[in-house]
């Protein structure tokens, strides 16, 4: 059985020691590349996004994340989403790879909302429509037989509000 490893440093995936391109790497050309324009901004946004994702996963697993004032608004937004939609997640931040196309990624959430199969990508910054559509399509390939009926970007804001944008499949 092949071994997929995810390395947070550099956001890299390897399959039996061979680096695989990620969904994010493949789709990044579809949006403004703020990473090259403002590297310091990219590092700050990436750290914040990782912290928010980790804290949201803790909430999904019934754990209480540490209170960090920098991300508390984002968590408040996620808690509001959970209360409003009461999702039943089947997958949470699970690194996966496609054995045929040899790419990897970590879909944020997939499961059920109101009896419908959904795939959700959590965002803490600007949502670039074309990039998110491509990213969700890549994640849909990775989750295989789940076949979501709806795909969403869930934008969490530091003000404590969320926006759920539906993307065509």
What spans do the regions from the language model cover?
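Metal-dependent nuclease catalytic cores that hydrolyze phosphodiester bonds in DNA/RNA
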Residues: 1-104
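Nucleic-acid nuclease catalytic cores
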Residues: 94-169
């Amino acid at each position: 059985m092949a071994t997929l490893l995810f390395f947070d440093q550099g956001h890299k995936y390897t399959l039996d020691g061979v680096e695989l391109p990620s969904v994010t790497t493949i789709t990044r050309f579809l949006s403004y590349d703020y990473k090259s324009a403002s590297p310091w901004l990219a590092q700050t946004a990436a750290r914040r996004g990782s912290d928010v994702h980790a804290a949201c996963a803790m909430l999904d697993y019934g754990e209480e994340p540490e209170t960090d004032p920098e991300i508390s608004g984002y968590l408040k937004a996620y808690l509001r989403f959970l209360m409003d939609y009461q999702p039943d997640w089947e997958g949470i931040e699970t690194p996966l790879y496609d054995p045929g196309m040899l790419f990897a990624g970590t879909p944020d959430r997939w499961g059920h909302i109101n009896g419908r199969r959904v795939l959700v990508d959590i965002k803490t910054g600007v949502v670039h429509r074309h990039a998110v559509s491509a990213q969700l399509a890549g994640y849909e390939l990775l989750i295989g037989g789940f076949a979501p009926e709806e795909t969403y970007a869930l934008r969490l804001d530091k003000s404590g509000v969320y926006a759920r944008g539906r993307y065509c499949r």
